[in-house]
């Protein structure tokens, strides 16, 4: 593959996933890791990537921008739907649950029984509107400053309200997790809310397709596998990651798209 084509493909991976791993790119593109490092250096010089240990991420303003946020719902659509369907199976009538603003979590509305009785709390404006269509679901929309990119409530007002509530189950989506189970993010506003939702829940379920698994962490730690009682992911998930879940005695539900 010619260098220019390779650079375009690497940039495309970055735009879709928010991060790339040198080893994975080397295997995917059939070139040496040294070649990938040189390619990443070029992207860094152009201002379209930021180097991390073992890979690269999008610059913060691009990672949080409309290109990334709008495109994430188009990534691994079949996997996300299968994960969302499995997540709905964890709901029981009368549950009080927290629904995150992730694209995988948002897909749950496609599979929820029409007449199920629930109380759903969410920071996501779009999720609140979708859940409100169900006749027996009581929706609490967390208020606060609304992010222009995620269309969800963020900031101290949202955090204070969330910290005053309790849930049976929190369904949490994450942008990035290492094989060792360290969950990180660039989105500072979202980190505090996800942490609060986990802390205020009896049980937390991690919803993540296999593209979220990487070797090295980025920027800010959000949580770890130990904070979750269940992981729902797809069959392409890294075997070392799955082994780590088993070692930590975390229930894993592996779905097929």
Describe the predicted segments one by one.
Residues 2-12, 21-23, 32, 45, ...:
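Conserved phosphate- and dinucleotide-binding cores of soluble alpha/beta proteins
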Residues 100-102:
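Glycine-rich beta-strand-to-loop/alpha-helix junction loops that act as flexible
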Residues 107, 127:
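Internal active-site segments that recognize and position negatively charged phosphoryl groups
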Residues 2-9, 13-28, 34, 38-98, ...:
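HTH-adjacent hinge/linker in prokaryotic transcriptional regulators
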Residues 94, 115-117, 201, 228:
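A general structural motif
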